[in-house]
Amino acid sequence: MPGQQRRGGGSGGSDRRERRDRSGGGPAQEKNAYVERVVAINRVAKVVKGGRRFSFTALVVVGDADGTVGVGYGKAKEVPAAIAKGVEEAKKHFFKVPRIGSTIPHPVQGEEAAGVVLLKPASPGTGVIAGGPVRAVLECAGVHDVLSKSLGSSNPINIVHATVAALRGLMRPEEIAARRGLPLEDVAPPAMLRARAAGAGV
């Protein structure tokens, strides 16, 4: 009988270890979640002596939907590998986007090759009024209310990089006031001033 008790106790210990392993694996698997958008996938060919070698390129936008975004370009023989390379490249080029609430601080224009993108602040509830490539960048950056217009090139690569150039050109009202030597009240949006007056901050 004592032997049976030992076997039962061993089984219970094993069950407890399994439960600990299962419960302990959860937090270890939790990682920072990023929003990923594949903007364009193209098949390209390289002409070599034996013929043509095909591969794929992927333009990917990655962000945390909270003011951080990056763009990457990946190339590989398979589409999933190209996307994975694009994601890693985008993470290497993360930058912060100044925001006021859910919109941008001021109108801004970005250019890349023949592509031009105009961005304007919008009131809460407006949404992202933009085409596919521009929308992908703004959503990954966490800009939820904005008006945009694309001019010139329709190439998604140019449009995405023009959007990034526009976002990089944004400045917070405090920076603008310091550069111009003006009080913050002269350059800050009314909504920001009301929020500060109410003690909510920005």
Curated annotation (Swiss-Prot):
The lineage of its organism: Bacteria, Bacillati, Actinomycetota, Actinomycetes, Frankiales. Transmembrane segments: none annotated. Part of the 30S ribosomal subunit. Contacts proteins S4 and S8. HAMAP family: Ribosomal_uS5_B. This is Small ribosomal subunit protein uS5. Residues 1-13 have a biased composition (Gly residues). Belongs to the universal ribosomal protein uS5 family. Residues 1-31 are annotated as: Disordered. Signal peptide: none annotated. InterPro entries: Ribosomal_Su5_D2-typ_SF, Ribosomal_uS5, Ribosomal_uS5_bac-type, Ribosomal_uS5_C, Ribosomal_uS5_N, Ribosomal_uS5_N_CS, Ribsml_uS5_D2-typ_fold_subgr. The N-terminal domain interacts with the head of the 30S subunit; the C-terminal domain interacts with the body and contacts protein S4. The interaction surface between S4 and S5 is involved in control of translational fidelity. Keywords: Ribonucleoprotein, Ribosomal protein, RNA-binding, rRNA-binding. One of its GO terms (cellular component) is small ribosomal subunit. One of its GO terms (biological process) is translation. Gene3D superfamilies: 3.30.160.20, 3.30.230.10. GO terms for molecular function: rRNA binding; structural constituent of ribosome. With S4 and S12 plays an important role in translational accuracy. Pfam families: Ribosomal_S5 (PF00333), Ribosomal_S5_C (PF03719). Residues 34-97 form the S5 DRBM domain.
